[in-house]
Curated annotation (Swiss-Prot):
GO terms for molecular function: phosphate:acyl-[acyl carrier protein] acyltransferase activity. PANTHER family: FATTY ACID/PHOSPHOLIPID SYNTHESIS PROTEIN PLSX (PTHR30100), PHOSPHATE ACYLTRANSFERASE (PTHR30100:SF1). GO terms for cellular component: cytoplasm. Pfam families: FA_synthesis (PF02504). This is Phosphate acyltransferase. Catalyzes the reversible formation of acyl-phosphate (acyl-PO(4)) from acyl-[acyl-carrier-protein] (acyl-ACP). This enzyme utilizes acyl-ACP as fatty acyl donor, but not acyl-CoA. Homodimer. Probably interacts with PlsY. It is an enzyme of class 2 (transferase). It catalyses: a fatty acyl-[ACP] + phosphate = an acyl phosphate + holo-[ACP]. It is found in: Cytoplasm. Gene3D superfamilies: Isopropylmalate Dehydrogenase (3.40.718.10). The lineage of its organism: Bacteria, Bacillati, Bacillota, Bacilli, Lactobacillales. Pathway: Lipid metabolism; phospholipid metabolism.
Length: 348
């Protein structure tokens, strides 16, 4: 059985949306047990059926106003901290929360812990590809865990993203690209130029060079690596642009009188299809990849369908052994580096 620890109190619509999503997922996935961490009385009042759902009382809640690291260190009986601790103690295979993003990241780093050899875990998300019959989505990493990144971090994101694309999206020989301000090999600042060289020399990944943000949704790569500041800005830009453009088109159609309104009715299904295609919550939450177990941050406004998608995502991560695969890669890398150091120099 797969066991998932869940912060029942995190998110704009918690605990109702979380509980509703968990109950729907429980009915879909017979091999999964759910550990709900939160205020027992509140959860019990909302829960309709406790089959394969365990409630663990958490007296404290980390709010959106709490300073993340301080809250994780001080609120030991909060739902986020207790869920993360369950993973560390082997009581659960993974945990997720729609609550305070910084606290989820801090709990992942300080409690669940990094895989040996990984400098900084990063947040990975899946985004849609439009107007490309051969590709429907791509992975982008980092989208906000680390505002600043070293070349080594970007190189490791290429490896982590490759594992994610292969095992979660069934991408064969996923193309890895570095987000930059031009496609030429010599583009970018010192960090990006150094990262380009590292990625070019990395075994086990299919590095295809630099990519510009304007081409991301066209399917130019399966994995796009970037620092967390840029990745988060690009993600929000995509969200905002898609929302604004759809609104502009709808206004243009509906503001042209009766004929426009009739045309709008005919186009309604098309609008809904576009909205659905651009909704990346269908892929679940953002994964803090590089930890010893799956830790997923879902959007604060997540409702039951997104909770179900996140649980589906976690089940796939556990069943496809992404974390053990990543750990083995970096263990072998460190072993090879040590072996090269231990080789005695030849006598002249």
């Amino acid at each position: 059985m797969i066991k998932i620890a869940i912060d029942a109190m995190g998110g704009d619509y918690a605990p109702n949306a979380v509980i509703e999503g968990v109950e729907q997922a429980r009915d879909l996935f017979e091999d999964t047990v759910f550990l709900l961490y939160g205020q027992r009385d509140v959860i019990n009042a909302q829960l309709k059926n406790r089959d394969r759902i365990q409630i663990i009382n958490a007296d404290e809640v980390i709010t959106m106003e709490d300073e993340p690291v301080r809250a994780v260190r001080r609120k030991k009986h909060s739902s986020i901290v207790m869920a993360a601790q369950a993973v560390k103690d082997g009581q659960a295979d993974a945990f997720f929360s729609a609550g305070n993003s910084g606290a989820v990241l801090a709990a992942g780093l300080f409690i669940v812990g990094r895989i040996k050899g990984i400098d900084r875990p990063g947040l990975v998300t899946v985004l849609p590809v439009v107007r490309n019959a051969n590709q429907s989505n791509f992975v982008m990493m980092d989208i906000g865990a680390n505002a600043d990144s070293k070349p080594l971090n970007l190189q490791q994101y290429g490896v982590l993203g490759t594992y994610y694309a292969e095992r979660m999206m069934q991408a064969k020989h996923p193309r890895v690209a570095l987000l930059n301000n031009g496609t030429e090999d010599d583009k970018g600042n010192k960090v990006h130029k150094a990262a380009f060289e590292l990625l070019s020399q990395t075994d086990g990944i299919n590095f295809v060079g630099n990519v510009e943000s304007r081409d991301l949704l066209n399917g130019v790569a399966d994995v796009v690596v970037t620092d967390g500041f840029t990745g988060n800005a690009v993600l929000k830009s995509i969200e905002g642009t898609a929302r604004s453009m759809l609104g502009l088109v709808k206004d243009a159609v509906y503001n042209t009188g009766i004929s426009g309104k009739l045309g709008g009715l005919l186009l309604k299904n098309g609008f809904n299809e576009i909205r659905s295609q651009m909704d990346y919550s269908q892929y679940g939450g953002a994964v803090l990849l590089g930890l010893k177990a799956p830790v997923v941050k879902t959007h604060g406004s997540s409702k039951a369908p997104t909770i179900v998608n996140t649980i589906r995502q976690i089940r796939q991560m556990v069943s496809t052994d992404i974390v053990p695969g990543v750990a083995e890669y970096f263990a072998n890398q460190q072993a090879n580096q040590q072996a090269s150091v231990d080789i005695p120099a030849e006598n002249d």
